[in-house]
């Protein structure tokens, strides 16, 4: 990993030089039709706010709804000695299936998705989650506030781990909470990335989270035959993936190697892209919660059985800018993505193996 980080720092320096000397000015960049800000694919829900829902991912949480149809899944260890939580992101309220078990909100996820005007859905939240929502005047749909008006549980309502919701249920409470499911001009964070024109009536759009394209030439991969992936968040938390050549996707596994299934349809969750980003983290004032540096870092991108070592930094046209191992700007293949933030503070690590079991990192 030390060699990886040395390479990452070198790549970042190279990319900075390239950006300084070769970046196109805004006036020279060709205008493009907006795409789905989560997948880079055709925009099916124009003018709508994406919806982000935190769900429980503890080892005992064997029933999870909505995984297989989320456009984007985020994962990070946000507190020591606790399980990771997943954040399932959908392109609009109308695209949300039954989702759960809904868990406490995490400000880390809202920070990552602020450029997309995300609508947060949660079951309560800690001090830092609430501080973030209050500071930016964001309103979440919170199960502790609206209860059975938007959340359900097949058993006793006190059975917290099984609370779930859906797009139809959420729609029923947005009006009373004064929450709009549509993008609003006042919250578009980068006006140069917005297609809104109040005079022409054009629908608003927001920047993509990741640089993506449907078609295009990719740089040579740093490794091929990347068949098995394991993200070890800490001693108790890990997520695995196995590559399926027929579907050209990475299929999600629990820490014990069992399939991570969507309770809505019994399907194993899979992704076109795996993006594992390394980020410096620090303990917050409570001595438990982790804060992540979202300015720059190294990482790995996996797609169709290939691996690229990358560096990342904040973007303007997209939330993240990515660079390959030669310091050149990198555009991912459009599709569903899993994005993990991995910290060095908790001994987290990434293992990628080929079909013979050889480590590729």
Predicted regions and their residues:
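C-terminal motif of bacterial Sec signal peptides marking the signal peptidase cleavage site
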Residues: 18-21
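Bacterial signal peptide processing site
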Residues: 23-26
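Bacterial N-terminal signal peptides that target proteins for export
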Residues: 1-9
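A surface/extracellular/periplasmic glyco- and lipid-processing/surface-interacting theme
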Residues: 29-74, 81-361
């Amino acid at each position: 990993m030390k060699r990886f980080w040395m390479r990452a720092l070198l790549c970042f320096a190279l990319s900075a030089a390239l950006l300084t000397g070769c970046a196109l000015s805004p006036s020279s960049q060709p205008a493009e039709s907006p795409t789905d800000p989560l997948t880079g694919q055709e925009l099916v829900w124009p003018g709508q706010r994406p919806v982000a829902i935190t769900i429980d991912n503890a080892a005992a949480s064997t029933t999870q709804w909505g995984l297989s149809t989320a456009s984007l899944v985020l994962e990070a260890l946000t507190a020591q000695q606790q399980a990771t939580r997943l954040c399932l992101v959908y392109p609009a309220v109308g695209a949300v299936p039954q989702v759960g078990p809904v868990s406490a909100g995490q400000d880390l996820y809202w920070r990552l998705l602020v450029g997309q005007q995300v609508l947060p859905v949660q079951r309560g939240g800690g001090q830092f989650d609430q501080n973030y929502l209050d500071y930016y005047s964001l309103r979440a749909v919170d199960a502790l506030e609206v209860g059975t008006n938007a959340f359900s549980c097949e058993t006793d309502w006190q059975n917290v781990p099984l609370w779930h919701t859906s797009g139809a249920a959420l729609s029923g409470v947005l009006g009373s909470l004064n929450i709009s499911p549509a993008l609003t001009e006042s919250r578009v964070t980068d006006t140069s990335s917005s297609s809104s024109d109040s005079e022409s009536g054009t629908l608003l759009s927001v920047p993509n989270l990741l640089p993506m394209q449907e078609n295009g030439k990719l740089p040579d991969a740093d490794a091929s035959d990347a068949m098995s992936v394991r993200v070890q968040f800490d001693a108790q938390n890990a997520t695995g993936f196995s590559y399926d050549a027929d579907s050209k996707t990475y299929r999600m596994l629990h820490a014990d190697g069992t399939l991570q299934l969507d309770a809505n349809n019994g399907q194993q969750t899979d992704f076109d892209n795996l993006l594992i980003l390394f980020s410096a983290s620090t303990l917050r004032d409570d001595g438990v919660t982790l804060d992540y540096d979202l300015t720059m870092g190294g990482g790995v991108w996996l797609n169709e059985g290939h691996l690229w070592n990358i560096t990342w930094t904040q973007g303007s046209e997209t939330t993240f800018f990515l660079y390959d191992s030669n310091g050149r700007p990198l555009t991912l293949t459009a599709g569903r993505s899993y994005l993990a933030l991995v910290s060095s503070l908790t001994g987290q690590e990434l293992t990628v193996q080929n079909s013979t079991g050889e480590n590729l990192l």
